[in-house]
């Protein structure tokens, strides 16, 4: 699922009464909303997870802080599941329940697109 679908999903499920049964898992999701958006999303869908592969650069954009074009700040919703490895079956991962907790482990000089293009040994394409 594309992270760009997040706002649409939030609009669809917000008025529903059974939204507590929905779980969302994203892979390599960038920051997609401000504090208000994330608060509504987390209240609407308690089971929402961002799965991040090692040094996936897409998960780090837009950078934290005010963006010059929108004059907004973008944030991740919680909970992140971070794999600091090749994501093969049985490897350990870190669960970060606080916003930006796993971001502290991210080393900007190691950021790369290859980690975004491979999740659980499945190669994605930008073609």
Spans of features found by a protein language model:
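Non-catalytic, mobile gating and regulatory segments of ester bond hydrolases
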Residues: 3-127
